[in-house]
């Protein structure tokens, strides 16, 4: 995207997120098949000027095997380690997925609905657009922006200006059913990148400022999860879970945000920059959210993202700028990540990958480098549908 007013799709025709290059086809290891019409060589001693025979390869030892276990195991990863390239991951216990890839991957610059739009234009909610809602009467409209985008991206979403400033959000994505999510949609995994220009709890009054709301309907009564800058509230729980964004989040920089809501297990798990946000309450101390309940009167509806951005309804954040993008939403925990540390627990910078094929023993992904500044020397992780992960990363 350009800083003036040319159409956004001038840079979106071949979205970087989905650029895919296949490795070149290779022939036989000896450089090609022998000519069938060639005469058979004399089985005796070779001519004096003949090339010496190739060395006999030494035993390389047994091929690696998966062995026993219950977690995904990566044995090999083939392909170039560059953004947009195709990587094939082989191993075992990945699980099967007949429909690989997220339900929605919105990198902004990969949305055909934004063709012809320019920097500063309002994000549309037309029938072909990914989102059905942009803001509210008390919020700033979300617009397209490009200034200081993450590496390999041409655009992102921005809320800024006016009396409400950084108060802006998108909601009810079409790919997940809009305001009528299907009844069997009881698990959501959501990942996105978020950059606040100021402390999202630094206004006066402070407010309760939502990063994301997950609902089953947009009526006055609903099942809900609301993650704010200081706590998380949810239906069914007897207490609010407290934890400040600024413990692990960074003002003025891009932050990886993740949340998993599972209505069948009754669990909510959320993360900032790879750190699990274990919450606390004065009555019990720290605790995990294992008592989330979807209200039975809404059994005909599943879960969807009602709000994503920054939602507060106050004027005390008028000077704030809210940037967000690279939104990945799926109905399974299964995914592929590349991280900055040799164990999953140590990773603090992870980039989610885009799967194009998935079976129990093989996964194909389109590589996303993000801001890792190179993929070689990083570590590969596969998470299965149950949330199991290879704790020891596979070195790239």
State what each model feature region is.
Residues 115-156, 162:
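Extracellular glycan-recognition surfaces and repeat-rich motifs
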Residues 234-256:
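Short, aromatic/His-centered strand-loop micro-motif at the edge of beta-sheets
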Residues 145-240:
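Secretory/extracellular carbohydrate-interaction modules
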Residues 108-109, 114, 192, 257, ...:
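Extracellular beta-strand elements of beta-rich domains used
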Residues 18-64:
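Ser/Thr-rich, Pro/Gly/Ala-heavy low-complexity intrinsically disordered linkers and tails
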Residues 253-269:
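Localized edge beta-strand/strand-to-loop motifs within extracellular or lumenal beta-rich domains
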């Amino acid at each position: 995207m350009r800083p003036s007013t040319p159409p956004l799709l001038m840079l979106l025709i071949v979205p970087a997120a989905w650029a895919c290059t296949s490795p070149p086809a290779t022939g036989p290891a000896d450089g090609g098949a022998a000519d069938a019409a060639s005469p058979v060589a004399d089985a005796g001693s070779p001519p004096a000027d003949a090339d010496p025979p190739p060395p006999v390869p030494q035993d390389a030892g047994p091929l690696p095997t998966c062995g026993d276990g219950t977690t995904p195991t990566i044995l090999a990863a083939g392909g170039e380690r560059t953004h947009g390239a195709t990587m094939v991951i082989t191993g075992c216990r990945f699980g099967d997925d007949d429909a690989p890839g997220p339900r929605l991957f919105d990198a902004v610059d990969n949305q055909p609905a934004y063709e012809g739009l320019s920097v500063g234009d309002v994000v549309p909610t037309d029938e072909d657009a990914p989102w059905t809602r942009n803001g509210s009467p008390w919020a700033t409209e979300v617009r397209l922006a490009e200034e200081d985008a993450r590496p390999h991206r041409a655009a992102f979403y921005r809320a800024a200006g006016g009396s409400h400033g950084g108060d802006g959000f998108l909601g009810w994505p079409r790919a997940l059913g809009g305001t009528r999510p299907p009844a069997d949609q009881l698990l959501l995994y959501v990942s996105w990148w978020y950059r606040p220009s100021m402390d999202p709890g630094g206004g006066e009054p402070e407010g309760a400022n939502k990063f994301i709301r997950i609902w089953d309907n947009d009526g006055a009564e609903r099942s809900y999860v609301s993650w704010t800058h200081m706590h998380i509230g949810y239906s069914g729980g007897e207490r609010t879970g407290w934890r400040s964004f600024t413990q692990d989040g960074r003002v003025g920089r891009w932050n990886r945000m993740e949340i998993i809501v599972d209505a069948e297990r009754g669990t909510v798990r959320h993360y900032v920059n790879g750190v699990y946000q274990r919450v606390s309450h004065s009555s019990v101390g720290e605790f995990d959210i294992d008592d989330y309940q979807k209200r039975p009167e809404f059994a005909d509806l599943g879960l969807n993202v009602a709000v994503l951005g920054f939602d507060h309804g106050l004027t005390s954040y008028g000077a704030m700028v809210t940037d967000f993008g690279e939104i990945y939403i799926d109905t399974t925990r299964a995914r592929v990540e590349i991280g900055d540390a040799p164990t999953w627990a140590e990773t603090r910078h992870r980039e989610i990958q885009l799967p194009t094929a998935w079976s129990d023993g093989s996964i194909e992904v389109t590589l996303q480098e993000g801001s890792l500044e190179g993929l070689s020397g990083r570590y590969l992780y596969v998470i299965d549908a149950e949330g199991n992960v290879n704790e020891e990363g596979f070195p790239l």
